């Protein structure tokens, strides 16, 4: 019985503080009552001098209990030794009880403070961003977001397996957190239901699941990806996310594994799409390895690209904005500027750079966000389209576009001499990895080949301590591409038109807006970019259609595969008729025209366009076929290369003009260090290979790419680049954590930002650099902009270099969206940065929404 009573008391005390306080109050009352009763009894039997009623004795007992000084007020003549002894016991009992209560309350408050600091309590933040896993990406990502949210309040919640106090200490040691930013940490795993309750998931703005670092807990990249995957699946299945299906972005190492978990969660995602509508943003994934490989590969095309990436997608200075027609503050501005092309807008705007248009039409069914970057110079801003631009802030965009109708200026033509980075590229890759699986290496090599813009990759040498025989057969190399341009294949050209599908008010009707017209096609004289092909008909049938409305004339078909069925209809009409009629809504006049095309002219155009496509395919195939014989793998003790590095080491490889240093194994050493010593080898290579000697008076045509592990190491090398001259035309430092953090930060604001980055790093568009050949050039940015716009490229910035007497260089300044009306003084070797397109064939082959007719 006693054990049961004792256990019941212990259980009650464990539950909360109130039970303990109630117990002490009850104990106090019982104690005073017992001692007062003893005093009263002793008074009655004559052992005590005073004689009081019991109530008086009890009241005096409580007075002695609550007031420790009351015992000194007792009259000595009326109390004997036993009076003082018993009454003194009441006072001592009171002191013990109150001391205990004070101790309990103090311990409770201390425990509560410790609980708050250690992240055991539920957070009450709302509209917050939750980050899962404290990886090496986190601090660079928080740095980016602190810059991004400089003008508004935002809360970040960090969930990791580390102690919250330690997490906050690491963050505060590196980042100066602005007053408008609140960061709190909690310990746990995303898949824990108790954790999901504590982080106020049902009121979160966004969830970002970072890939944890390879280490003691997660031994391999597979372990890391599975942790992200099970976190993703658990969060999507939680009751909290069901209440609040906020944006979710998950980082995987392997893209295939990411899509595997997304597909596994498809039932929940599809149901949410039905509930939330087509405008709801479904969960998205990124592959950190793909992103790194792609950026590194693009640096072989455009040296110093990493600097451009940092400036364009960072949050200091100008950045990318999507001017959305769904946003009320932009809708009227966009309507006023419909019909203007990129060239028109950039000629009239002095403070922003328009780099393209986009359409996000989710009527009737879910559709891709269509991004038209560096669109043809005659492709106009159309109804329901938004603008993609580079600007300092939203106020600048509104002010610029509002006043565009008042702008009128004449931009002079200039004729400077620039050189592109289209020299033959010969690459030496120094692989310091210790991995037994070569998949990382084959993926990187294929990424370099796939990203090559000029078809100028002539050789690739890989140096490594040891190779197994699996690479020598070169079966991992991509097959020569087949662009499927032959008859009855998807990219077979008929009219030489690239188009995308336009929705109409009716679900089963659509139009086909012309994006561009091949220069070989005679239709370029009759049609323009922006015109909408409503339908196609025979000459006889067309006569019966002239009185019909635009909607009635629009092509009717069930959704899915519309472009294929329309193309089949066109082919059939051409086969059966000597002429066909294109029913077109002109973009300028908005009038519907019936345009006749002769069969023989179609045949001539088709042959010319097809021939140009064959030449594109042939050039690409030739490069890849030649590479099979010019990719070599050589075993070399790279530790000796580093240890014995001297001024002459680099000259052994001077016949190659692109050096890449990387270590996949070090990428997996992801411990948080003040001094990441695993990067010392790469820093030594960076310094050693910077001793490349240039021929007298010759400007650099070599480039170097160094992959390092820690963002602290990156800061050191960036500081070197700023203060020391380099013999390289471009000197890229690739650091995975900064790359991924910028990508994630961009996606935090608008997922279209990540789609834009993907486009710029695909075989659809590319970022190019043009080196000034002239000794000097003075021109406004507007004049330079016009010069490149006429070449169908969009100028976004300038890299200004400082040169020494030996033609070595260091970056003096990178200007993205500089002041456009002021004169810019450029010297020989300075580089202008543009966004350019791959050819038409690559665009339709890579794009999900552009098709060829």
Label every model-predicted segment.
Residues 1-59, 63-546, 550, 557-559, ...:
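Cytosolic regulatory regions of ion transport systems
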């Amino acid at each position: 019985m006693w054990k049961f009573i004792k256990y019941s008391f212990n259980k009650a005390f464990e539950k909360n503080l109130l039970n303990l306080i109630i117990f002490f109050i009850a104990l106090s009352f019982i104690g005073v009552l017992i001692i007062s009763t003893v005093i009263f009894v002793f008074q009655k039997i004559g052992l005590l001098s005073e004689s009081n009623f019991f109530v008086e004795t009890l009241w005096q007992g409580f007075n002695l209990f609550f007031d420790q000084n009351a015992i000194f007020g007792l009259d000595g003549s009326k109390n004997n030794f036993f009076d003082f002894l018993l009454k003194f016991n009441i006072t001592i009992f009171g002191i013990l009880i109150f001391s205990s209560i004070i101790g309990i309350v103090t311990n409770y408050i201390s425990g509560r403070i410790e609980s708050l600091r250690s992240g055991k309590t539920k957070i009450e933040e709302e509209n917050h961003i939750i980050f899962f896993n404290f990886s090496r990406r986190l601090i660079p990502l928080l740095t980016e977001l602190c810059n991004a949210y400089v003008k508004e309040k935002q809360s970040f919640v960090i969930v990791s397996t580390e102690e919250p106090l330690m997490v906050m200490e690491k963050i505060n040691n590196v980042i100066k957190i602005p007053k408008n930013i609140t960061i709190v940490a909690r310990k746990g795993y995303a898949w824990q239901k108790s954790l999901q309750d504590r982080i106020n998931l049902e009121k979160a703005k966004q969830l970002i699941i970072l890939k944890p670092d390879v280490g003691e807990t997660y031994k391999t990249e597979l372990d890391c990806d599975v942790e992200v995957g099970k976190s993703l699946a658990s969060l999507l299945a939680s009751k909290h996310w069901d209440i609040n299906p906020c944006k979710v972005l998950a980082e995987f190492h392997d893209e295939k594994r990411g899509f595997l978990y997304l597909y596994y969660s498809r039932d929940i995602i599809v149901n949410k799409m039905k509930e939330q509508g087509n405008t709801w943003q479904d969960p998205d994934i990124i592959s950190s390895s793909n992103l790194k490989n792609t950026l590194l590969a693009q640096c072989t095309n455009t040296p110093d690209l990493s600097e451009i990436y940092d400036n364009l997608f960072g949050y200091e200075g100008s950045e990318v904005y999507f001017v959305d027609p769904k946003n009320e503050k932009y809708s009227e501005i966009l309507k006023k500027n419909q019909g203007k092309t990129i060239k028109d807008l950039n000629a009239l705007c002095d403070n922003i750079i328009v780099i393209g248009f986009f359409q996000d039409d989710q009527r009737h069914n879910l559709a891709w966000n269509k991004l038209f970057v560096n669109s043809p110079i005659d492709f106009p801003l159309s109804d329901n389209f938004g603008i993609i631009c580079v600007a300092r802030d939203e106020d600048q965009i509104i002010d610029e576009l509002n006043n565009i109708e008042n702008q009128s200026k004449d931009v002079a033509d200039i004729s400077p001499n620039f050189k592109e980075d289209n020299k033959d590229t010969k690459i030496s890759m120094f692989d310091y990895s210790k991995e037994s699986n070569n998949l990382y290496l084959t993926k990187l090599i294929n990424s370099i080949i796939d990203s090559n813009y000029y078809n100028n990759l002539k050789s690739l040498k890989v140096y490594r301590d040891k190779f197994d025989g699996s690479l020598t057969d070169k079966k991992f190399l991509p097959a020569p591409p087949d662009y499927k341009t032959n008859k009855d294949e998807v990219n077979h050209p008929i009219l030489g038109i690239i188009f995308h599908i336009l929705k109409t008010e009716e679900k089963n009707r659509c139009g086909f807006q012309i994006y561009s017209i091949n220069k070989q096609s005679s239709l370029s004289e009759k049609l323009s970019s922006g015109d909408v092909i409503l339908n196609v008909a025979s000459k006889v049938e067309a006569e019966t259609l002239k009185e019909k409305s635009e909607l009635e004339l629009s092509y009717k078909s069930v959704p899915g595969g519309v472009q294929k069925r329309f193309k089949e209809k066109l082919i059939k009409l051409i086969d059966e008729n000597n002429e066909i009629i294109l029913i077109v809504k002109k973009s300028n006049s908005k009038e519907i025209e019936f345009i006749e095309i002769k069969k023989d002219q179609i045949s001539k155009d088709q042959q010319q366009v097809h021939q140009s496509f064959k030449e594109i395919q042939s050039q690409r195939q030739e490069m890849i076929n030649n590479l099979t014989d010019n990719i070599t793998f050589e075993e070399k003790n790279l530790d000796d290369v580093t240890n014995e590095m001297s001024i002459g080491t680099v000259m052994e490889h001077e016949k190659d003009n692109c050096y890449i240093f990387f270590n996949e194994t070090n990428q997996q050493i992801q411990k948080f260090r003040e001094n990441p010593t695993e990067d010392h080898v790469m820093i030594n290579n960076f310094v050693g290979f910077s001793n490349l000697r240039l021929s007298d008076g010759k400007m650099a045509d070599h480039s170097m790419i160094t992959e390092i592990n820690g963002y602290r190491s990156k800061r050191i090398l960036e500081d070197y680049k700023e203060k020391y001259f380099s013999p390289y035309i471009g000197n890229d430092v690739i650091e995975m954590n900064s790359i991924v953090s910028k990508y994630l930060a961009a996606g935090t604001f608008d997922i279209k930002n990540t789609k834009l980055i993907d486009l710029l790093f695909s075989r659809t568009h590319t970022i190019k650099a043009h080196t000034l050949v002239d000794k000097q050039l003075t021109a406004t940015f507007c004049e330079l902009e016009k010069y490149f716009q006429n070449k169908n490229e969009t100028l976004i910035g300038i890299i200004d270099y400082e040169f020494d007497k030996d033609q070595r260089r260091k970056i003096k300044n990178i200007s993205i969206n500089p002041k456009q009306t002021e004169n810019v003084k450029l010297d020989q070797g300075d580089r202008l940065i543009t966004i350019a397109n791959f050819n038409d064939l690559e665009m339709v082959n890579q794009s999900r929404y552009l098709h060829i007719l």
